A protein has these predicted regions:
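PP2C/PPM-type serine/threonine phosphatase catalytic domain
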Residues: 1-281
Length: 281
């Protein structure tokens, strides 16, 4: 069972709901160029997938797409808490940043506002106590890509055939890897691999990682929940992004995660930096 461990040493668990809750999935469309607003350097060609998986009874992931934002929120909490948290993060981020000029300050402020709103919500409704969500979002800003990150969903960048993880997991085992106490291989099977040290909404304040990376023509970006990266290695993801087009890569990533057990909800967004004269696949 999945656990979320926050900085006050409270443990919130990612439960299966006792009663199935219907959650509409984002419509799966062919990838199309999406405008990124007034600071646009080039359009992104985007496709996304989300699936409940083979074990859980409902989907607590939320795909964020709109207002120039691309992201994943992976909710946690019993009853409807996980869905409430991830959906609240999605709607809160879209509302907070609608029409705003992209900046690191605006992104950090939006995440803080969402965190406060979710925290207040569970104070008002004790049935939501312990809810929270990961949050990893991309926000194009001219020739830069802004990234906001809390938790263990991930953002990757594929450039010149090499895939690298650009966010750092806020998890117990990731901290142990960074301190040299575990190898990445050991971390992948460690019994505490599903404990995270930061989540949106579990405390009155939040410290988000805010990154700014250069955008280059032909770059590919991947944002995904742990339901994907927990079952597919970096090498798996890199191979699919290099050898197949955007749509095929998304389909194959989802298929492989399901074939390997689909233990959690699976969500991903793939985006490619458009090049002159390029059309959607």
């Amino acid at each position: 069972m999945r656990h979320k461990f926050n900085l006050s040493n409270r443990v919130a668990r990612k439960f299966q709901n006792p009663v199935p809750v219907s959650v509409p999935k984002p419509e799966e469309k062919d990838p199309v160029p999406e405008s990124q607003g007034p600071a646009e350097a080039r359009p992104l060609i985007i496709t996304s997938r989300t699936d409940t998986g083979l074990v859980r009874r409902n989907n607590q992931d939320a795909v964020i797409q709109g207002s120039g934002l691309l992201g994943i929120a992976d909710g946690m909490g019993g009853h409807n808490g996980g869905e409430t948290a991830s959906a609240g993060a999605r709607e809160g981020m879209l509302q907070a940043l609608e029409g705003r000029e992209p900046s690191e300050e605006a992104l950090e402020e939006a995440i803080s506002q969402v965190n406060q709103a979710l925290w207040n919500r569970q104070l008002e409704d004790t049935s939501l106590s312990g809810m929270g969500t990961t949050l990893t979002v991309l926000w194009p800003a001219g020739d830069r890509m802004l990234i906001g990150h809390v938790g263990d969903s991930r953002a990757y960048l594929l450039r010149e055939g090499h895939l690298r993880q650009v966010t750092q997991d806020h998890s117990m085992v990731a901290d142990m890897v960074r301190r040299g106490l575990l190898t990445e291989e050991q971390a992948s099977t460690h019994p505490m691999r599903n404990y995270i040290t930061r989540a949106v909404g579990t405390e009155p304040t939040i410290q988000a990682d805010i990154l700014s990376l250069e955008r280059q023509a032909g770059d590919q970006w991947l944002v995904c929940s742990d339901g994907l990266h927990g079952l597919l290695s970096r090498e798996d993801l890199e191979r699919l992004m290099v050898e197949t087009n955007l749509e095929e890569a998304a389909d194959e990533m989802l298929r492989l995660a399901l074939d390997r057990g689909g233990r959690d909800n699976i969500s991903l967004i793939l985006a490619r930096e458009d090049q002159a004269g390029e059309v959607a696949e």
